[in-house]
Amino acid sequence: MKTSSLVLFAVAVVAFLGSAPGFAQETTADAKHPIVLHAARLFDVGAGKIVTPGEVLVEGERIVAAGTSVEHPAGAEVIDLGDTTLMPGLIDAHVHLFLHPGAEDLQTVEESVPQRTILATLAAKADLMAGFTAERDMGTEGAGSADTAVMRAINGGLIPGPRLRISGNAISILGGHEDAIRYNPAQHVLSNADYANDAEQIVETIREQHKEGSTFVKIYETGPDSLIAGGQPGMPPVAGDPEFWDFHSPYQYTEAQLKAGVEEATRLGTNVGVHDQGEPGALYAAEAGVASIDHATQLSEETMQLMKERHIPAVPTFTIFEYFAEHAPSAAAAAREHAMLDYKIHEFKRQVAAGVPMAVGSDVGPFPHGTQAKELELMVEYGMTPIAVLQADYLNGAQILTWQDRIGKLKAGYYADVIAVPGNPLADITEVERVAFVMKGGVVYKQQAVGNRQ
C-alpha cells in the first residue's frame, strides 16, 4: 500500500489546477476585513428554531457573533442576503469523491489514479457549491491515499472544496466486500479495499494508512447483501409486509477484531466508521465502540439500545438506494432495488421510533456530486421532522468528524462556514437543495443574486 508515483503525480496535477488562471480564487480570509452577513432569518441549531432577522459577524476564518443583530465594526463589509435563511454549512458524513455515476468496477479498473484524482477535485468543488462545507470521504475505492492530495490541496487553498476527513482505501477481508471477486484470477485485478484478515493486520493497516495521511478509518463490516422473500433467495418481494422479509448481510470481523481497530484509531486520535448493513455485524460494531454505523439497514433491538446509550449515530444513505432503484439496468434489477429501498424505509422508521441517533450521509459519488442535499429531504419523507434532520446533520455530523467544537453552529469561535437558502427550511426542507450563498472559513465561494454587497 505504498504511495505510488501515480499518486505523487496526482498531487502535482491538483497543484497545477489550483494555480491555473481563472481556477483559484482568494481562499484566505482577511482578519482585518470584517464581514457582516444579514438575512431575513437565521437557523439557531442548538435551540432548533428560526430567529428573525439574522446576522453573523465574521472576522478572518471565524464567527465573532451571531443572532438577530450583531455589532457592525467600522469599515465592515455588509452582505445583505435578503429573503434567505442563514445556516451553518451542511455536513455530509458519507461521500465518495473518487467515484462518479457509472459502473464502479470499470472506474477503478479503467481510470488511472491521476485521472480519478482530478475528477475528485471537481467533485469536491461541486459539493462545496451545493453548500456542503464539511465531508467525510468514505474510501477512495482503489485509489489508495490519493485523497490525501485532495485534502491538502483544499487545506492549502489551491482548490475549492469542503473540509475533509479522509480514510484512503477502506479495510476489508480477503474475498470480502469490494474485493475483485468477479474477475478472471489470472488478470490480478486489485481490490478496491486494503486487506486485513485479523486484528493484527487491522492494526498494521491502520498504521500504514495513518502514515499516508488518513484522518479516520473506514472498515467494511458486512456484505454482500441479500433480501429473501418466501424462502426464495434472489427473488424480490413484490407484496406484503417488509416485517416478514428476510435480509442477510454476513459480518466480516468479530467484535474483538473491530475493537482492536477502534483502540488503534483512538490511540492515533481518530475514529472508525463502518459500512454495516445487518446483524450481528452492527452489534459487533456498536460493542466495539465505532463512531458511526453507515447504511444501518438492519439493527436489532439490542443494537439500537446500545447506539442510544453510547450515542453512536446511524447514517442511512437513502439517496444512493433511491438512485439505484430509479436507474436500474433492467426491470428485474429495478424490482430488486425498489424492494431493498422499501425494506430500508421500514427499518428506518423502527430506528427513528426507537430513538437511534442519526447523522446525514448521502453516499454521493455513484450519483452526481452536488445533488446530495436530497438526503435531508428523504429523511424527512421517511419519518423525521425537518428540525430533527438538520440537527442530525449539524450536531451528529460534527461529532462523527470530531469537529463538534468548530462546525455545525453559527456561534462565536466556530469556523465561518455559512450558507443561505431561500425560504424557511423548517417549513420546507427542500430549500436546502437551493443554496444561494456559500462561505467557508470566511471566504465567499458562491453568491447568487439574492441581496446586495455594501
Residue ranges and their predicted role:
Residues 85-158, 174-177, 182, 288:
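Metal-associated gating/positioning segment near the N- to mid-region
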Residues 98-116, 174-190, 225-251, 310-341:
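Active-site gating loops and adjacent loop-to-helix segments of metal-dependent hydrolytic enzymes
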Residues 149, 200-314, 338-357:
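Histidine/acidic residue-rich metal-binding segments in metalloenzymes
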Residues 267-271, 340-425:
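His/Asp/Glu-enriched, well-ordered alpha-helical/loop segment
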